[in-house]
Swiss-Prot record:
GO terms for cellular component: cytoplasm; cytosol; GID complex; nucleus. Its EC number is 2.3.2.27. The lineage of its organism: Eukaryota, Fungi, Dikarya, Ascomycota, Taphrinomycotina. The keyword Transferase applies. Residues 116-148 form the LisH domain. It is found in: Cytoplasm; Nucleus. Keywords: Cytoplasm, Metal-binding, Nucleus, Transferase, Ubl conjugation pathway, Zinc, Zinc-finger. This is GID complex subunit 9. Identified in the GID/CTLH complex. In the absence of stress, the complex exists as an inactive anticipatory complex (GID(Ant)), composed of Gid1, the E3 ubiquitin-ligase Gid2, Gid5, Gid8, and the RING-like subunit Gid9, awaiting a substrate receptor to form the active E3 ligase complex. When cells are shifted to glucose-containing medium, the substrate receptor Gid4 is induced and becomes part of the complex, named GID(SR4). Additionally, Gid7 transforms the GID(SR4) E3 ligase core into a higher-order supramolecular assembly (Chelator-GID(SR4)).
Length: 404
């Protein structure tokens, strides 16, 4: 079966975008760090030169401080350079993996099956990382050599920040907001505002009203024009720090806000890093199961309906397998306009040379494959045995099946 490589690229797009986004963010960190440190060092040197009356000890102390700062900058830059090298390596590996499709012309070829197996392992590892199974995902990546195709570090940091929010700690999420402030602002995100509001609310809960006022003056001025109603609602807590349930302010004081902050962080994290909100493994399973799902897959095995009896013999259908049958219950049925009738004995299509026949119990097989199977199993003359139930029926009781 021929295929077009570009049809497969859509599943690789999120990983490629994430690699480029990591490179962009890392470059911004390098640029911002260099600009800040250069400004500080130049300002210190200018001040040192202009202070002609300063003692030698004071000058030596400032020079030592500068040397220490330069050493710290060097270590920081080395760390950022190592991160950049890692992101470049990951990007190159993902592009090479995607480029392997160019030499494949058949979806049934061994090359495409090997490529698909690697992709499946990557999708499973991504799913496990997104759901907190970091240890299992790391082992899978190591065994399958997927370290450069799966963003283990990204998901680990996400889990760390998400868990810290649920533990009512805001330091990690504020640090993340600071690193990505530009893109959060571009996306009109309110994550940092909500995190700052939560810190303000916690100060009020602790009866630290003076500290809460100082905190509001220091951090809320930026959002005063954009979110005045939200800030006014929070400011009312200074005058009325306790409210009964059902009041307009009770939601601000509720512990449910921590769940809300964790959910808000998740949506912002996926938007910043171009991570699909629904795992690709979910999307692929849903599409595949829905394309194969028919009413026959969900007939009761104890039903006397002949279709229910026949459905138990279709072992090639993925939707009929116990592990996938439950997953497909909520999915729509396939919109099939042209059916292919398959022999349950051989898995091959039925045609005029191997026309379908039905036993009295309702089970249907191809006549030629049924005769061949019975000859191989020594059925007595004039009878045919049902391969599924093992019962024998006279040949004349078989009925020809017509598909309309």
């Amino acid at each position: 079966m021929n295929f077009r490589p570009e049809q497969q690229y859509i599943l690789e797009k999120p990983g490629i975008l994430l690699s480029f986004e990591q490179l962009r963010i890392n470059f911004k960190h390098i640029l911002r760090h260099l600009e800040h440190e250069s400004h500080v060092i130049n300002s210190t040197l200018t001040t040192l030169i202009s202070q002609e009356n300063a003692s030698m000890d004071e000058k030596i102390e400032k020079i030592d401080s500068l040397l220490s700062r330069v050493s710290t900058v060097k270590k920081k830059m080395k760390h950022l350079h190592d991160c950049e090298a890692l992101f470049i390596k990951q990007t190159k590996s993902r592009l090479l993996f995607m480029n392997r499709l160019q030499g494949i012309r058949d979806m049934e070829s061994a090359d495409f099956l090997d490529w698909s197996r690697v992709r499946l392992n990557r999708l499973v590892a991504d799913y496990m990382m997104a759901n907190g199974y970091h240890g299992a995902a790391a082992l899978l990546c190591k065994d399958s050599q997927l370290e450069n195709l799966v963003d283990l570090g990204i998901y680990k940091r996400y889990q760390l920040i998400h868990d810290s929010i649920l533990q009512q700690e805001l330091k990690e999420v504020l640090s993340w907001c600071s690193e990505h402030r530009a893109i959060l602002k571009k996306n009109n995100s309110t994550l940092e505002l909500e995190v700052r509001l939560q810190r303000f609310i916690e100060l009020i809960k602790s009866k630290k009203l003076c500290q809460a006022i100082a905190f509001a003056k220091a951090h809320f001025g930026t959002w005063a024009n954009e979110h005045p109603a939200r800030l006014q609602l929070a400011a009312a807590l200074l005058a009325f720090p306790e409210f009964t349930n059902g009041s307009p302010y009770s939601l601000l004081l509720s512990d449910d806000r921590w769940e809300y902050l964790a959910s808000l962080f998740t949506s912002n994290f996926t938007a910043v890093h171009n991570i699909p909100s629904v795992p690709l493994l979910h999307a692929l399973l849903a599409a595949g199961l829905s394309s194969l799902k028919t009413p026959l897959c969900y007939l009761d095995a104890n039903d006397d309906n002949p279709l229910a009896l026949q459905s138990q013999t279709v072992k090639q259908c993925p939707v009929c397998t116990p592990c996938l049958n439950d997953l497909g219950k909520a999915l729509p049925y396939a919109h099939i306009t042209q059916s292919a009738i398959v022999d349950s004995l051989t898995g091959e299509g039925l045609d005029s040379d191997n026309c379908p026949v039905a036993f009295p119990n309702g089970r249907v097989y191809g006549i030629q494959s049924l005769i061949s199977w019975n000859e191989a199993n020594g059925t007595r003359e004039g009878f045919l045995r049902d391969p599924y139930s093992g019962k024998e029926f006279p040949f004349q009781l078989l009925r020809k099946v017509y598909v309309v």
